Every structure is written in structure tokens, then in C-alpha cells.
Curated annotation (Swiss-Prot):
Belongs to the insulin family. Heterodimer of a B chain and an A chain linked by two disulfide bonds. CDD domains: IlGF_relaxin_like (cd04365). One of its GO terms (molecular function) is hormone activity. It is found in: Secreted. This is Relaxin.
């Protein structure tokens, strides 16, 4: 997936892309809930979360 696809992704779609990129990602339910509730679409936040979750 390209970075542009990640920038456009929000909520569940962003989580789906994370799973595709990272493979089997082990994350807590709290992290997943935070991602879905914040619906973070900002490049910096996405990069930070990918680094943290992957």
C-alpha cells in the first residue's frame, strides 16, 4: 500500500491497512479502541502509530 492510501484511511479501514502492512500485529484492545475512536488521518500520527504497533 502506498502512503497516500494510508493518509486517506480512517477508522476500521486504517486498521485493515495496518494488518496488511504489518502482518500479524499484536496490539491491545485499548490501542485498537483509541485508533477507531480518534479516526486519526494525519500523516505524523499514522507514522507514529505504525511504528508503535508494528
Amino acid at each position: 500500500q502506498s502512503t497516500n492510501d494510508l493518509i486517506k484511511a480512517c477508522g476500521r479501514e486504517l486498521v485493515r491497512l495496518w494488518v496488511e502492512i504489518c502482518g500479524s500485529v499484536r496490539w491491545g484492545q485499548s490501542a485498537l479502541r483509541m485508533t477507531l475512536s480518534e479516526k486519526c488521518c494525519q500523516v505524523g500520527c499514522i507514522r507514529k502509530d505504525i511504528a508503535r504497533l508494528c
